[in-house]
Amino acid sequence: WFQICAESINGYLSSIGKDPYRISKIHYFQGNYSDSIWSTADNTDQILNYFGPNGLNYIPSTPGELGGFLAPDYENDDYSNYDDTIVRNAINQNPGYVLMNRDHGWYSLWDCPAFGSEMVPMLTNHNKLPFVLSINCASGAFGNKNCLTESLIKIENAGGVGVIAPTFETHTHSNDSYLWGVWDFFENDFLPDYGTSVENNNNYMPAFANVSAKHFIYQQNFPNTYQNTRELTSNLFHAHCDAFLKLYSEVPQQMNIEHDNSYYSENKSFNIKAPAGSIIGSSTEDYDGIKTLAIAEGTGSMQSINIPEHLNPENNLYITVTKTNHLRYEQSIEIKTDNAFVTMEDFFFDDNQHNLIFN
């Protein structure tokens, strides 16, 4: 059942031009595994009819047609098959933008394929930090010393940029439903018959996906999920990341930005050319810190951004442009004026003379 969940996601990603790297392991079948069926769990046929050849065609009719599964060495009772080395090397060499585990797990480990907190210090995926979807049991138990989630986050310049994981024992079928909800938030076309009707434009925001998936498991009635297991799942999964974290789902590109090199406070507008669909923000210093002035959507042509307030000369106008799968653009613009002005650096009040002195 773990495989049918994970491979339905891999199949979708392949259908949109991604190239997911799979490390799939047969789990504890004691040599009796058959590659002719996905699962013996109740209602497997409903899931297969939806994701398989008769439905969305993300997976074949049998796992044998897919292939690529690692098998344990039953004779020597070796279930690891050097899993931790395989997983570690994959993360180090090509971590991708999402690292997903769908299997059994516990406080400091993934079970099959095996990987644990003790392997995290050996990760060297510098400056290429994936977001981790750890969909299992208890791998996000932050009250337990050295849980896997904290290990992946705390290691310097390696591991993951954030993790979604549960804090204790979970229900497997509800986990599947939850994970499908996460991916339907990331990619709105993943489940065309289910999920949110709000267009997300494929913004990969894990903390928002976590919340959306919890609504998803209550809205949809996937097989073998129940009211109590939905509540359990909703309570246990947490997003260990910044609330507004956005992921790159492609190698990020530079944006071509053109704009005025200076800003005169008398103008009340600023000219800029930014890619269509980008978000343009302008801000400046204020007594309480940085203050947002205006936000606009880029058109791909030169456009004028209204600056609603008078800005003090010698301050800076900050221009920020963001767009999905593009590197953030930031520029500081000097604020000028053609008029005379007075700048107050500090002041002193003499209580004895009742004088206020400005410098």
Residue ranges and their predicted role:
Residues W1-I335:
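Cysteine-dependent hydrolase recognition
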Residues N235, N339-V342:
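A eukaryote-biased signal for short, well-structured alpha-helical docking elements
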Residues F341-N359:
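Beta-sheet-dominated interaction scaffolds and their linkers
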